[in-house]
């Protein structure tokens, strides 16, 4: 500003700037070069070059990536190969997980994961030493590559407990901790594992200052929070919510295990506890299906022209910003910087949205 320049729109993240500049939403048609094709990739994408892991990793790094990402496909393209397309129901993959832990010392006794891929569910009941349980869960995440990760109250219990236990097992080495909690959709490489400024490496789940968990490339979607927002239940326990949704279906209710005496239950009937864990893993998937939570997030992203991640985890202001900034750009109106970032500027005077009423207005 001392030279007579006023900088605007300078604090919009590049990934958002791409959507804004090209007027893209969550549904995109793209054309480019296939760098990697995994087992689940379309057959026409598979060649000796695209299925060779070492060669694919080298090609991804040459294109600007950090290594071989745990994805079905990696495609390189430039902005000329991107365009908005008509909305379609994306074939999202969802993984639900649950932990059963010791009351005495907080250790993980057993776990379960269920992956829903197009309506077909694969169960992973997991037992063994605590390190083996965490490693197996991470293997499931990186092999099955889910878009959404759910469970019941994972924001406040399961994810914090896994972070705590992984740090207790490997307190001094991020590289040793990565196989225990490397859930991010990034390569398990040194650059992705090392700590950033005031935050863990990109490969690890991270709880932001607003208490929301982020997992790079994936979307945590707590079924507890979705039920709370949509149903407004009198009580928020999984037992109560499942009976509220399916009052006459015993198969959809929690099993009779006393979680307050989990050490005793695990010692006397471990098979029943594991079955209880699997049931508690399946119910969040059923809750999300019943509430149409994922379809709602995708529809919101399509209308607001944001990523599904922002539609699922962010606030009303981000959705409205996506539309208003495009309008400002079309009309030649400068968008001032906010007071965020390393060099805070003057605060923007204005209003904020209390509530958005659904409906169509003329």
Question: Where are each of the predicted segments found?
Answer:
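N-terminal accessory regions of nucleic-acid-interacting proteins
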Residues: 1-88
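Active-site-proximal helix-loop-helix substrate-binding element of RNase H-like nuclease domains
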Residues: 121, 145, 149, 159, ...
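Extended, Lys/Arg-enriched charged tracts that mediate electrostatic binding to polyanionic substrates
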Residues: 60-62, 66-91, 95-97, 188-213, ...
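Conserved RNase H-like, two-metal-ion catalytic cores of nucleic-acid enzymes
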Residues: 68-150, 169, 185, 347-359
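A short acidic (Asp/Glu
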Residues: 106-108, 154, 159-165
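Common nucleic-acid-contacting/processivity interface regions adjacent to the catalytic cores
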Residues: 26, 32, 36-57, 260-362
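Acidic beta-strand-to-loop metal/phosphate-binding motif
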Residues: 1, 146-155
